[in-house]
Amino acid sequence: MNEYGFNTGLLHGTNEKYPQGATQVPIYQSSAFRHDSAEDLEKIFDNKKMGFSYTRINNPTVESFEKRVTMLEDGIGSVACASGMAALTNAFLNILQAGDEIVAACGLYGGTVELFDDLKPFGISVKYVKENKPEAFEAENKPEAFEAEITEKTRIVFAETIGNP
């Protein structure tokens, strides 16, 4: 993004060319994509060739978004997810393995707590910082409370900016 300012980079930074001369990213609403041969599609599914197979895996609209986020953050790559829970699941499953633990605040979104419960069969444990009582809520969010729970097995320290007291 060095050659553009932030706003110009948003519009033109990836220098993508769009089909039929579109000036902005087209929104691809197709669930599947046509290929010249079954062998061609097989190479895409086997990650031996770049391309699109099924929109839940990736599509040109999402790919364009990921390229722009990467450019704006001066990163090496990005992954767009359909929801916050999908993003958390993706991050956790890429960081954690059996025997690891998460140190977490108590006042979390219910979906996050359910995700943590779903990780238990994979040998991943969660330690909550304090009991989930209103009077404990303020104390649980102090850094010292988290530090006291961290062990050699801790791979993630997790809190949400808007918790559920």
Set out the residue ranges of the language-model regions.
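Active-site phosphate-binding strand-loop segment of PLP-dependent enzymes
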Residues: 137-165
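Buried hydrophobic positions in well-ordered alpha/beta secondary-structure cores of metabolic enzymes
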Residues: 21, 69, 87, 102, ...
